[in-house]
């Protein structure tokens, strides 16, 4: 997993929750799923 403040470049990146959680929270990433859904998908 990359640094937690990195953006989600691809849907697969969201399989690393802490990589994208901050970007998702700030609506900076391309992941639009909820955090709980990220865990379930991966």
UniProtKB/Swiss-Prot annotation:
Disulfide bonds join 1-15, 8-20, 14-31, 16-42. Is the sole lethal toxin in male and female A.versutus venom. This is Delta-hexatoxin-Hv1a. It comes from Hadronyche versuta. Expressed by the venom gland. Belongs to the neurotoxin 06 (delta-actx) family. The keyword Transport does not apply. GO terms for cellular component: extracellular region. Pfam families: Atracotoxin. The keyword Disulfide bond applies. GO terms for molecular function: sodium channel inhibitor activity; toxin activity. It is found in: Secreted. Keywords: Disulfide bond, Ion channel impairing toxin, Knottin, Neurotoxin, Secreted, Toxin, Voltage-gated sodium channel impairing toxin. Inhibits tetrodotoxin-sensitive voltage-gated sodium channels (Nav) by binding to site 3. Slows the inactivation, and causes a prolongation of action potential duration resulting in repetitive firing in autonomic and motor nerve fibers. Does not depolarize the resting potential. Does not affect tetrodotoxin-resistant sodium channels. This lethal neurotoxin is active on both insect and mammalian voltage-gated sodium channels. The presence of a 'disulfide through disulfide knot' structurally defines this protein as a knottin. Its main location: secreted.
